[in-house]
């Protein structure tokens, strides 16, 4: 699902497994030492969000939300990536919520504006897919009901 939006590339690019492993090792080394820096936690959360795995993306959102809740000084930098994580997880309501939060403070933020476009396009696309599935299901039910009705009239 590549995008033509230059600022939204972040939402659709991934880290290599080796790059993610470097961030993971740093984060867990600090856990073993008994003190995790906000920067290491942020870097690892960011890396997890840039993973192609929904499980890892979910973990990344969780780490960034922990920073968001515990450290008001780091909320701005977490807000965009939390929105990206929710977008990648197809949780568009939360993606929109966090992205709009950032846009309310920084209306000119090009990354957030591009992400907003991606979110809205995804909502429309998923809505059309949902309508298509419902229409197909109704058609099948109609065919079955018509067939049953036709047989009962014989």
From Swiss-Prot:
It comes from Cryptococcus neoformans var. neoformans serotype D (strain JEC21 / ATCC MYA-565) (Filobasidiella neoformans). Pfam families: Fis1_TPR_C (PF14853), Fis1_TPR_N (PF14852). Disulfide bonds: none annotated. Keywords: Membrane, Mitochondrion, Mitochondrion outer membrane, Repeat, TPR repeat, Transmembrane, Transmembrane helix. CDD domains: Fis1. The gene is FIS1. The keyword Membrane applies. It comes from the Eukaryota. This is Mitochondrial fission 1 protein. TPR repeats lie at residues 76-109. The C-terminus is required for mitochondrial localization, while the N-terminus is necessary for mitochondrial fission. The keyword Glycoprotein does not apply.
């Amino acid at each position: 699902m590549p995008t033509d939006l230059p600022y939204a590339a972040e939402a659709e690019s991934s880290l290599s497994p080796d790059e993610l492993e470097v961030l993971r090792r740093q984060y867990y080394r600090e856990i073993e030492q008994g003190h995790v820096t906000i920067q290491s936690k942020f870097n690892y959360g960011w890396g997890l969000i840039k993973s192609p795995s929904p499980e890892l993306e979910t973990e990344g959102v969780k780490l960034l939300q922990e920073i968001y809740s515990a450290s008001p000084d780091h909320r701005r930098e977490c807000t965009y990536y939390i929105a990206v994580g929710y977008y990648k997880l197809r949780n568009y309501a939360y993606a929109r919520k966090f992205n709009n939060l950032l846009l309310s403070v920084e209306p000119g933020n090009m990354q957030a504006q591009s992400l907003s476009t991606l979110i809205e396009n995804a909502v429309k696309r998923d809505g059309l897919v949902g309508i298509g599935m419902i229409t197909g299901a109704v058609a099948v039910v109609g065919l079955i009901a018509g067939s049953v009705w036709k047989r009962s009239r014989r």
